[in-house]
């Protein structure tokens, strides 16, 4: 019984990481850029139909919806070798093609105008699935389309498909360099409100950390977008391997999410990946064992979220899921878990069990890989709140001076007042407070005292 997943790609960032993701999936399943299964790909052990469906003439088409308010990125996809992979009916470009101008309010209000056309596409995809499990949304939170239209769609998806899961891959802006989007803190904060209230699970892709990993670990001097996006597609494909090469555990999205998210609002996940190498020379001097991979995943330098050091709060893991790919002896897994617990290599919440789960997954038989074992960590860690605190600090600076609010005032949602902004600030603050509360033993009764 396949549990299908529909991917929604929004805006420049969403479509670029989505494009890399589909490239990666095609390579892993032995599907050519035109969607034809390659001659060598005859093993029937993978489940292609979670992410693809078959057209009448046997070729595979991604269950993807490509949305943008300006044509550039989608045109570049349509001029690539993968142009014929997608269903052309699933591509939506807005009529006037002016984009959202990096303005959340513009993306949001354009969403109100065009949502019927978009939901025609989404409903058609949903009707074409046997038992739809949910939606995966790829977007960035700092721009206009991914954040504004993304926020609008998150709200509507909840109304329209209340029982379906919504998972997002949300790209957070790079804090190490100056942004050319001056209203980025506003956009981010408004989107965070929706990610808190309308998504079941948010995988945080932090550009700050991804750039650092590319420079420090992969030794790329000035990483380009496409190199960063390859990192992202590695994470995205690894986090879905258990769905595509099903084992006896974690073979659907809810299984993945349930083990990581014990309380509904704390659903922002960080990821770590190892071994990260682009050159083959390193591969020959390193023996990768399960313990090795699991220990490395706990090292901060492999974690793809750059979190601040907070001396006051004793930050800790709420839950960890390691997806280990490759040749693994299951007894080794048990031993590794024991070692990690005995040596207290990870600091866990005081109010619940130290939950480290391990999902073993096969690797794609069609891709050569330099390493016997590779691993992805998906972790729910309270320190992710430092990202939100950073956004709030930047927002407060701008809001105090009422800087750049003119562009927002043009749209209906902000015509009379900026309540929506202040309300979002409040909700993100509650989220931060709850993450801090989760580091204390009395978290279970948190939120009941003040009612």
Swiss-Prot record:
Cited Pfam families: Tubulin, Tubulin_C
Coiled coil regions, renumbered to chain: none
Top-level taxonomic group: Eukaryota
Keywords: Cytoplasm, Cytoskeleton, GTP-binding, Microtubule, Nucleotide-binding
PROSITE patterns in alphabetical order: TUBULIN
Binding residues for GTP: 142-148
Matches recorded under SUPFAM superfamilies: Tubulin C-terminal domain-like, Tubulin nucleotide-binding domain-like
GO MF annotation: an example: GTP binding
Main location: cytoplasm
Membrane-spanning residues: none
GO cellular component: centrosome; cytoplasm; gamma-tubulin complex; gamma-tubulin ring complex; mitotic spindle microtubule; nucleus; polar microtubule; spindle
Disulfide links within the chain: none
GO process terms (BP): cytoplasmic microtubule organization; meiotic spindle organization; microtubule nucleation; mitotic cell cycle; mitotic sister chromatid segregation; mitotic spindle organization
Localization (cell): Cytoplasm, Cytoskeleton, Microtubule organizing center, Centrosome; Cytoplasm, Cytoskeleton, Spindle
Similarity comment text for this entry: Belongs to the tubulin family.
Protein function: Tubulin is the major constituent of microtubules. The gamma chain is found at microtubule organizing centers (MTOC) such as the spindle poles or the centrosome, suggesting that it is involved in the minus-end nucleation of microtubule assembly.
Name the record gives this protein: Tubulin gamma-1 chain
Designated gene of the protein: tubg1
